[in-house]
Amino acid sequence: MGANRLVAVHIDEETLGASGPDAEHERRVAIFDLIEENTFGVIGEDRGPYVLALSQHERRLVFAIRTEPGEEVHTFILSLSPFRGVIRDYFTICDSYYEAIRMSTPHQIEAIDMARRGIHNEGSELLKERLEGKIDIDFHTARRLFTLICALHAGQGRAPGA
């Protein structure tokens, strides 16, 4: 395996707060999938593979990156403001999706799921743009990281289904 990848991802448990079983499962799957297959390179660095600690502090997203042995590489701090609208839309469509699973036809569920994936893709592209020049990630890595960003945001007082 190459050096431009993540070998571990840690999420600040204090930021996460309490979450429901659906959100917790989605987070675990995203981390597992992320570790299994990802592209993650810190621009200007060649010390990978990397360990990522993801947290939220004062309405900012914190990417603390270390080498596998634990040497600090870089900490990137991004404003969450550009993500607020897409995260809000994502939670709204997730609420609709979980409701549809209980009460709707397969066709309706599929339509809502397509919309959910579309919003998720939008958030993933936004993340790639915001990390441009800092961290090189592929689209699939961005999708999984966006899932984790939503989990952090949910821990700050808004969770799907709430």
UniProtKB/Swiss-Prot annotation:
Q: What is the lineage of its organism?
A: Bacteria, Pseudomonadati, Pseudomonadota, Alphaproteobacteria, Hyphomonadales
Q: Which domain of life is it from?
A: Bacteria
Q: Which family does it belong to?
A: Belongs to the UPF0262 family.
Name the InterPro entries on file: UCP032146 (IPR008321)
Give the originating organism. Answer: Hyphomonas neptunium (strain ATCC 15444)
> Which Pfam families does the protein's record reference?
UPF0262
Q: What is this protein called?
A: UPF0262 protein HNE_1347
